[in-house]
């Protein structure tokens, strides 16, 4: 717990916290995050941080949320960037941003489903692409679906958010993604953003 608070202080109070000590040791900051959060959240913060404090040696361990928590328990990292699991106690959390889980697909996929299965509800006919059961995003969405008595008939599990996005873009099914991350990725390729794509809010 002490190391986590010290790491947060290092980020927030950089000019006061990061100094060479009397033995001139190089300051170190050990971070843990999933590959998705590293790509879509951490990198932009690190770019500015490194520019301000180029003398800090930073290491990043890309792991799942629960593996990141384990590294914190073992004091192998100082700070973890994670999606907060429900009912988790014993850690100090500093909120960074709110995310919205969203189902996304191409307009063509929806049209094809209506042609192929005109009498079936989309929930029963479509293929829904989700992260694996151990993922925090998947667990959160599962809880929301259960609360609304929604049961998906056809689920394709995928290991990474990037693959979910790519599969949705080629019309393989309806992907459950983090909305802002999807829009960032789409925006880099197309200034028109979500043109030709349909969103279904899940949160």
Question: Residue locations for each model-derived region?
Answer:
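Central regulatory/effector-binding core of bacterial HTH transcription factors
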Residues: 26-89, 158
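Short hydrophobic/charged patches on amphipathic alpha-helices used for structural packing
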Residues: 69, 73, 93, 117-120, ...
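Short beta-strand elements of ligand-binding domains
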Residues: 79-84, 106, 131-132
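Secondary-structure junction motif
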Residues: 111-114, 126-148
């Amino acid at each position: 717990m002490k190391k986590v608070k010290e790491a947060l202080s290092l980020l927030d109070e950089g000019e006061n916290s990061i100094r060479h000590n009397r033995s001139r040791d190089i300051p170190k900051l050990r971070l843990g995050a999933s590959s998705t959060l590293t790509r879509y959240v951490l990198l932009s913060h690190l770019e500015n941080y490194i520019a301000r404090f180029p003398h800090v040696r930073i290491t990043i361990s890309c792991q799942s949320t629960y593996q990141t928590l384990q590294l914190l328990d073992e004091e192998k990292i100082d700070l973890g960037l994670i999606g907060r699991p429900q009912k988790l106690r014993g850690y100090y959390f500093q909120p960074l941003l709110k995310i919205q889980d969203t189902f996304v697909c191409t307009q063509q996929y929806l049209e094809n489903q209506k042609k192929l299965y005109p009498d079936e509800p989309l929930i029963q006919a479509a293929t829904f692409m989700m992260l694996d059961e151990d993922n925090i995003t998947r667990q959160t969405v599962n809880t929301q679906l259960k609360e609304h008595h929604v049961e998906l008939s056809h689920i394709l599990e995928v290991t990474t958010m990037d693959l979910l996005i790519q599969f949705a873009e080629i019309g393989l099914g309806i992907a459950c993604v983090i909305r802002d991350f999807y829009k960032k990725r789409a925006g880099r390729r197309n200034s028109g953003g979500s043109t030709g794509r349909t969103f279904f809010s899940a949160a």
